[in-house]
């Protein structure tokens, strides 16, 4: 199964499509989302300042029919299938789960404790604390009353789940992002299985020019301090110190080389330097 998969799960009207759209799913005008959302898959391309990657957002819903009032028992039945041997490939391919709750729904609040109990089972089936993925509970509501959000947050965090109140904005007193920004940040900071670096072309060019200039010293007898090159301010100080140390060791090794061997070695070192910058 392809890498970079996230499951968005919840009962009807729990904000699954809203969460998917925030992550990056696009909904065309031809789509009919009035029925069950089970089986919807959105394949998107995400890009941040540092990387870009493909992502599959897989949406699922319980119960199977919208004519049935959802309850924690339906989630439990869903989890039995999810934890079955037939679903092992899916579980292994998941990078994360976003579980959505509609806090305006009285049944949702009534079923909160057994619902989170089922989520704990699902989490353990993925490997628990050893699982490299993320598991977030996302709450939506139309009410300005935050009491239900506080109740769900307490129940979630005490069991080790992150809770995101999708109606919040800005930052908390610890300068942590809230609401939509936190959901996006969760995806931006995850260690995805399959990514490509995404850097500004101008910055990348400056890095290569600086690396080429530094590595030219391996071919020269110039003892000028290599840390004086223009462009040093473009990189982290600690990273740059690692680069300088690597170049010093490379200079010593290059002294025993001549001609083509020395040129080839300088090229190899330059590529290594680029990985540091």
UniProtKB/Swiss-Prot annotation:
Residues spanning the signal sequence: none
Pfam families for this protein: Adaptin_binding (PF10199)
GO aspect biological process, one term? vesicle-mediated transport
Note whether Secreted occurs among the keywords: no
GO MF terms listed in the record are: protein-macromolecule adaptor activity
Query: Which of UniProt's keywords are assigned here?
Result: Chromosomal rearrangement
Task: Give the family this protein belongs to, as stated in its UniProt record.
Answer: Belongs to the IRC6 family.
Function recorded in the entry: Involved in gross chromosomal rearrangements (GCRs) and telomere healing.
Which protein, by its recorded name, is this? Increased recombination centers protein 6
The organism of origin for this protein: Meyerozyma guilliermondii (strain ATCC 6260 / CBS 566 / DSM 6381 / JCM 1539 / NBRC 10279 / NRRL Y-324) (Yeast)
What is the organism lineage in this UniProt record? Answer: Eukaryota, Fungi, Dikarya, Ascomycota, Saccharomycotina
Q: Which gene encodes it?
A: IRC6
